[in-house]
Amino acid sequence: MYRVLSKLSSSIGSSTSRKLVSGRIISSRNYAAKDISFGIGARAAMLQGVSEVAEAVKVTMGPKGRNVIIESSYGGPKITKDGVTVAKSISFQAKAKNIGAELVKQVASATNKVAGDGTTCATVLTQAILIEGCKSVAAGVNVMDLRVGINMAIAAVVSDLKSRAVMISTPEEITQVATISANGEREIGELIARAMEKVGKEGVITVADGNTLDNELEVVEGMKLARGYISPYFITDEKTQKCELENPIILIHEKKISDINSLLKVLEAAVKSSRPLLIVAEDVESDALAMLILNKHHGGLKVCAIKAPGFGDNRKASLDDLAVLTGAEVISEERGLSLEKIRPELLGTAKKVTVTRDDTIILHGGGDKKLIEERCEELRSANEKSTSTFDQEKTQERLSKLSGGVAVFKVGGASESEVGERKDRVTDALNATRAAVEEGIIPGGGVALLYATKALDNLQTENEDQRRGVQIVQNALKAPAFTIAANAGYDGSLVVGKLLEQDDCNFGFDAAKGKYVDMVKAGIIDPVKVIRTALTDAASVSLLLTTTEASVLVKADENTPNHVPDMASMGM
């Protein structure tokens, strides 16, 4: 054994050639060389990437924004007006530029994740703050004071936006918000308002491909669980990062599953029935999880595992609700049931299950309608008898999930490209509408940010460098209104100048009609949450790059192509 290790050691030592150069030992091991840049040079290259992505994204802004055609490495080209989709599709060969592009993608993705819309606005604001910030730093402004000034201005603007917010509740107001976010398509706005009316403002609304030329709304029996897939290896659609199971069988287990052998009968049942499998358990661990992933990727079995929702007694109750909805039995020792002795009739069914990173939607459960109604009646009765506010809230939540249903927005179109583009708009409109219901609305078209510049006129700062930070934000707040007008074919500077002369904060420019109107009365409104999130995310990322003093990049290998695959072609 010693001789084997010695030979191995000597062979490793000899395989790495070393030579003495100028008194230093240089190893021929393949360590990646680095390019280091400092100061203006480091920021300039990254700023170029930010600007090029922003220019591509900003053409989509407003009611007369233009389409962007994106080439994909597979399938046909994608045509879209969705800012985050455009941003994600862009990458550069130059590494410094690509870092700038990635920063814009971070802004767009973060805004989209929190507010569901406003990605184009966030990108435009990022470019505006960043360009002025980098110029100021290059001119000798103290970057830390500049940062303080920008943060002070952002806080003041957010406060101003919240003070002018108007809460919405009527179907017409909801329709207006959804229509704006759908780039002026009122039909989409009306369908979203109808969906919210049917399932409630907190209800589940999903977006799916339709089978006709027209958009349709369908309310189906379903349940949403606040649990996503245990492992991303269960994903079936890389583009949407979802796992979709059509007509699956469903196993509901009360405890953790870690033993391979305990799952064999369930997997056999799935294979024999040629149906996907959904597993709901406290957890699926180690060998059992590995076997499921192996069967999916090499055995061709569509399978997904999620953790049971809730904790303690609430978890047990939720699993019982799910069992009633799907026609399953909860496998537990208390009921004398075990995985080793499982029978097909103990498994539940559903027409479709969609699992994301954060939640699971089960549509058309295979449970007996009479039993479901009896379960709902039990919950209503328990809710009336309960004296605990907490218990009442939990019971009402369970009742809503069991009886409320799920609204499915089926997007129609003449081609796959058209359906894809319309789905982007419907998703944006749906998210923006939820945001509007949550935090209220303000005048749209960029005018709320434009008038917020007046709130910064008298903002007190400690020195001129901080004042410069405030001025940067003031100038950046004009960019959205300018861009919307310019995309509609009007002089953005003239429009912005005229609006700033007004005292009425609802007065704005309707770019679709080319008129100056009362924006709220005209139905041109934005959710406060969308604009607030876009502004804060843009400032955050802009400050990261403005305060960057050095960049360390891996030097490109001349023998290999320096291509970074775009996120859209990878399905991200």
Swiss-Prot record:
Gene Ontology molecular function: ATP binding; ATP-dependent protein folding chaperone
GO annotations of cellular component type: cytosol; mitochondrion; plant-type vacuole
Main location: mitochondrion
SUPFAM superfamilies with a match to the protein in the record: GroEL apical domain-like (SSF52029), GroEL equatorial domain-like (SSF48592), GroEL-intermediate domain like (SSF54849)
Name of a matching Pfam family: Cpn60_TCP1
Keywords assigned: ATP-binding, Chaperone, Mitochondrion, Nucleotide-binding, Stress response, Transit peptide
Cellular localisation: Mitochondrion
Keyword Signal: no
GO BP terms in the entry: protein refolding
Transit peptide: 1-31
UniProt family annotation: Belongs to the chaperonin (HSP60) family.
HAMAP family recorded: CH60 (MF_00600)
Function text: Implicated in mitochondrial protein import and macromolecular assembly. May facilitate the correct folding of imported proteins. May also prevent misfolding and promote the refolding and proper assembly of unfolded polypeptides generated under stress conditions in the mitochondrial matrix.
PANTHER family with a match to the protein in the record: 60 KDA HEAT SHOCK PROTEIN, MITOCHONDRIAL (PTHR45633)
Protein name stated in the entry: Chaperonin CPN60-like 2, mitochondrial
Organism annotation: Arabidopsis thaliana
